[in-house]
Amino acid sequence: MKCNKMNRVQLKEGSVSMTL
């Protein structure tokens, strides 16, 4: 479950980076 949360954060960060 903890890994899932980390993955979600990474995905969110990646999305922001892609948008930028």
Swiss-Prot record:
Residue spans crossing the bilayer: none
One of the protein's GO biological processes: response to antibiotic
Region named Disordered: 1-20
Entry keywords, A to Z: Antibiotic resistance, Leader peptide
Pfam families (UniProt xref): Tet_res_leader
Claim: rRNA processing is one of the keywords in the record: no
Protein's name in the database: Tetracycline resistance leader peptide
